[in-house]
Amino acid sequence: MTSESRRAVRCLIVIPCLNEARHIESVIDNLADALLDLNAVIVVSDGGSTDETRSIVARYASDNPKVTLLDNPQRIQSAAVNIAVATYGADCDYLIRIDAHGDYPADYCQRLVDEALATGADSVVVGMRTIGISPFQKATALAQNSKLGNGGSRHRMGAASHWTDHGHHALMKISAFRQIGGYDETFQHNEDAELDYRLNAAGYRIWMTDKTSMVYYPRAKVLPLFRQYFGYGRGRARNFMKHRARPSLRQMIPLSVAPLAVGALLAVINWTAAIPFAVWAGACLAYGAWLALGQRNPYGPLAAISAMIMHFAWSAGFWREVLGQKKATPAYMPRKEPSI
């Protein structure tokens, strides 16, 4: 793709963030080539950071008119992107979403634009590689990069380029984003999958590219990992209930984990009640042993524990949302409109 073709379209690069002083500088620096090669602006949509994030971004903005700091009063990522599009997206062709906790190749945005122009896709999504630094992070990364942790999700498995119905959000036509109403701001988790559901329903096409990808760093401790996946489970449940969709087979297996754990408590009455839970735990531990022996990875056993935490938290969050909605949902619940 020629530089003229790239610069013929205008891109809005949005970075949702909250208290990212440790990362935001390197993220913006990494986008320097994108600002040179593309007709693009960067909007850092900040949810009220109390560390040095805002002052760092303000410094960049004072030095470069292509960088802007924007307030996000709602603090959540879905609203961060919506408000950026509403404020700065009117004359832009493409929205590019950048995560403050990720690492990206220097030509990431350029590759996305090339793929969008070459395929005519309405959305371009990317694969995600998880990398750890601490021992627990390395174990969690091993789990998340394996079928034990991702269930064979293609955007986690390095699949070749293909048309898909969901992936890690990277680029989207502003016109498509606006037409379907942007992100649903009632979603604090799983807003990307929920938007992709509406995108597909409206007839738009999503392209998974293998020409670029991002690196993600998982949570470094047990409790943050549990909370993250508990939130993912709740978000996925809300998505299914909103669109009256059904879980896939890949999702059904971890969905059963929390009920199995509750059922195992009945072992005090009859020991056979613990068998299903024991089978699941044994399968996870066996897979971890295979990772350790078959792939000669010393973090295999700990990866099994990380996967069990993710499975249980995701399942618990899912059922918490389902049961909570059944008890609390009124006969009619209006959807909160996005701020675009």
Predicted regions and their residues:
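Short, acidic, metal-binding catalytic loop of nucleotide-sugar glycosyltransferases
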Residues: 29-39
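A conserved acidic beta->alpha catalytic loop
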Residues: 46-55, 74, 102-105
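Glycine-rich, basic loop-to-helix element that forms the pyrophosphate-binding segment
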Residues: 72-90, 111
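Short beta-strand-to-loop acidic/aromatic patch adjacent to the donor-nucleotide binding site
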Residues: 92-103
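Conserved donor NDP-sugar-binding/catalytic core segment of glycosyltransferases
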Residues: 106-138
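Catalytic donor/gating beta->alpha subdomain of glycosyltransferases that bind UDP-sugars
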Residues: 116, 184-247
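A recurrent flexible, glycine/aromatic-enriched loop bordering the glycosyltransferase active site
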Residues: 131, 153-175, 188, 194, ...
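Membrane-embedded multi-pass helical conduit in multi-pass membrane proteins
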Residues: 257-328
